[in-house]
Curated annotation (Swiss-Prot):
Subunit-level organization: Forms homooligomers, possibly octamers. Directly interacts with POLD1, POLD2 and POLD4. Interacts with the N-terminal domain of WRN. Interacts (via UBZ4-type zinc finger) with monoubiquitin and polyubiquitin. Interacts with TRIM14 and PPP6C; these interactions positively regulate the RIGI signaling pathway.
Comp. bias (Acidic residues): 92-104, 159-184
Function: Functions as a modulator of initiation or reinitiation events during DNA polymerase delta-mediated DNA synthesis. In the presence of ATP, stimulation of DNA polymerase delta-mediated DNA synthesis is decreased. Also plays a role in the innate immune defense against viruses. Stabilizes the RIGI dsRNA interaction and promotes RIGI 'Lys-63'-linked polyubiquitination. In turn, RIGI transmits the signal through mitochondrial MAVS.
Protein name, entry field: ATPase WRNIP1
Location of region: Disordered: 48-190
Length: 665
């Protein structure tokens, strides 16, 4: 369970205030410990001073302090309740201590200088403040806002925390020394990289193509975390492919931008952006002091839900604070578990956001569904998939190669640091977008697998052949992408709505005598993992319902196909089903029996009062008593007559009714 932090709570800002001994900022006493943990990472040992603005960017430029320095800072700062401004001698002494660990002694005025290479190398070794967008690192540049705040009065704790996070994220996409090296200058890109950045344009968030990364840097960025999670956007500006639901001027987007979030059920196929939209709502909620809690119905229990609701009641009663509860895979909760939300959604204790791949009409309690707004997210179009993939490719520093140009990037041996470490063919990007079938998660993870596999295979080849490994000559082709995905990502759920959609499409295609469409829907189901016996049972039904007496042998064909599937199974039985499907599509159709039987059922359901009794002459008379009561009296045994027998077989109340002529009671 994930819960948003209390940093922006206006109530907590009114509690007892204390001063941080490191950065001199005022904050509630309850948060001093967590603040010190972050503050000691951002400020090197020996540089505590009361000025709130000017020293902060300089300390970031020097990089995080070593673990030993952090412990010294903690022991020194804990003994100071109200530290004074250090003298020049004390400042020099503290900087000398830093120099013992490998740093250089520098005066306070040198804080504005760009970070040194050694400082930049320290950044990956220590945790940094959370970033608002994936793939971005802290910048070593001093922000202009920090320079202007050098002589400002001490800020409130909320303002200081906001600027610390803003400075930790940085302004650029590259490393802190990117501007100093000039590697982020578009003049250092080659022509194809510049064209790729221009083509990406505003759809990539307005950021330029990142600087060229070494192959090992790309490998490290892709290891340990799925690329789909790393590239998850935080804003609606980077949320692509769902313009119908959250596009400009839509009702939902207006509600999200004004932070008036209703209870929602997000329904759509896997990888269409349900969880990402909830993540964007969570990011926006934290800025407005709204508590956001995440649960997954796959592992959460009813007690977990009750605990969250109890906390939400306390937050609302004491702090007047809203709570948004996001339930992923909400269809995994049974009806009694879903009933737990009803009174609390009704009275506004929580705002419920549920995500599901199943039809809410079948899987979500009707009472709960009536209290939520259903947002249908469609499968991502190919254009949106290309944009999402290009955003990830640019963040990895991979250069898109125009297949129409004959230049081979592997033909030259330049080792310039600004040269891209990896290339990918533009047709490989298009192929990946098509094979992903609208699933952004499958597409991004397929890209990650293709990149890692290509790097590993080239490294192994160079090792076996005795050649020197040249990471700047790696090319990802269309075949690499196909091997990474193996086959098209087929969306099919044997227990969900797509299951019923496909069997309905097969049934209607055979009824319409379209043999091509019938084969397509059959293959779609079987390749998606459908049980062949289920399809065979439906064909038996079709033989009597839609073909009927127009071709009585169709029922024999269907039963034979079912038995054959039972005998040999998949994949051999697929041709048996295909033969039966084509036979049914070509066969004449008749619903005479099917319609007549439906008329009989309607007659029985609409009959008023008790059903009419069976006529006496049609009753069986196995005993003497029944014969004495008139059972079977007057019945004419038809085989004994050469001519048709004039005899009534329906109850007297139904005489004259012809169910085959579409007459209803």
């Amino acid at each position: 369970m994930e819960v948003s932090g209390p940093e922006d709570d206006p109530f907590l800002s009114q509690l007892h205030q204390v001063q941080c001994p490191v950065c001199q900022q005022m904050m509630p006493a309850a948060h001093i410990n967590s603040h010190l943990d972050r503050c000691l990472l951002l400020h090197p040992a020996g540089h505590a001073e009361p000025a709130a603005g000017s020293h902060r960017a300089g300390e970031r430029a020097k990089g995080p302090s070593p673990p030993g320095a952090k412990r010294r800072r903690l022991s020194e700062s804990s003994a100071l309740k109200q530290p004074a401004t250090p003298t020049a001698a004390e400042s020099s002494e503290g900087e000398g201590e830093e120099g013992d660990d490998g740093g250089e002694t520098e005066s306070r005025e040198s804080y504005d200088a760009p970070p040194t290479p050694s400082g930049a190398r320290l950044i990956p070794d220590f945790p940094v403040a959370r970033s608002s967008s994936p793939g971005r690192k802290g910048s070593g540049k001093r922000p202009a806002a920090a320079a202007a705040a050098g002589s400002a009065s001490p800020r409130s704790w909320d303002e200081a925390e906001a600027q610390e996070e803003e400075e930790a994220v940085g302004d650029g996409d590259g490393d802190g020394d990117a501007d100093a090296d000039g590697e982020d200058d578009p003049g250092h890109w080659d022509a194809d990289a510049a064209e790729a950045a221009t083509a990406f344009g505003a759809s990539g968030g307005g950021r330029p193509h990142p600087r060229a990364l070494a192959a090992e840097e790309i490998r490290q960025m892709l290891q340990g975390k799925p690329l789909a999670d790393t590239m998850r956007p935080d804003t609606l500006q980077d949320y692509f492919g769902q313009s119908k639901a959250v596009g400009q001027d839509t009702l939902l987007r207006s509600l999200l931008e004004t932070n008036e979030i209703p209870s929602l059920i997000l329904w759509g196929p896997p990888g269409c952006g349900k969880t990402t939209l909830a993540h964007i709502i969570a990011s926006n909620s934290k800025k407005h002091s709204i508590r956001f809690v995440t649960l997954s119905a796959t592992n959460a229990k009813t007690n977990d839900v009750r605990d969250v609701i109890k906390q939400a009641q306390n937050e609302k009663s004491f702090f007047k604070r809203k709570t948004i509860l996001f339930i992923d895979e909400i269809h995994r909760f049974n009806k009694s578990q879903q009933d737990t939300f009803l009174p609390h959604v009704e009275c506004g204790t929580i705002t419920l956001i549920g995500a599901t791949t199943e039809n809410p009409s079948f899987q979500v309690n009707a009472a709960l569904l009536s209290r939520c707004r259903v947002i249908v997210l469609e499968k991502l179009p190919v254009e949106a998939m290309v944009t999402i993939l290009m955003r990830a490719i640019n963040s990895l520093g991979i250069h898109v190669l125009d297949s129409s140009r004959p230049t081979d990037p592997l033909s030259h041996s330049s080792n310039s640091s600004s040269e891209p470490a990896m290339f990918i063919e533009d047709k490989a990007v298009d192929t990946l977008a098509y094979l992903s079938d609208g699933d952004a998660r499958a597409g991004l993870n397929g890209l990650q697998l293709a990149v890692l596999a290509r790097l590993s295979s080239r490294k192994m080849f160079c090792k076996k052949s005795g050649q020197s490994y040249s990471p700047s000559r790696v090319l990802i082709t269309e075949n690499d992408v196909k091997e990474g995905l193996q086959r098209s990502h087929i969306l099919y759920d044997r227990a969900g709505e797509e299951h019923y959609n496909c069997i309905s499409a097969l049934h209607k295609s055979m009824r319409g005598s379209d043999q091509n469409a019938s084969l397509y829907w059959l293959a779609r189901m079987l390749e998606g993992g459908e049980d062949p016996l289920y399809v065979a049972r439906r064909l038996v039904r079709f033989a009597s319902e839609d073909i009927g007496l127009a071709d009585p042998s169709a029922l024999t064909q269907a039963v034979a196909a079912y038995q054959g599937c039972h005998f040999i199974g998949m994949p051999e039985c697929e041709v048996l089903l295909a033969q039966c499907v084509v036979y049914f599509a070509r066969a004449p159709k008749s619903i005479e029996v099917y319609s007549a039987y439906n008329n009989v059922k309607a007659c029985l359901r609409n009959h008023q009062g008790p059903l009419p009794p069976v006529p006496l002459h049609l009753r069986n008379a196995p005993t003497r008593l029944m014969k004495d009561l008139g059972y079977g009296k007057g019945y004419k045994y038809n085989p004994m007559y050469s001519e048709p027998v004039d005899q009534e077989y329906l109850p007297e109340e139904l005489r004259g009714v012809d169910f085959f002529k579409q007459r209803r009671c």
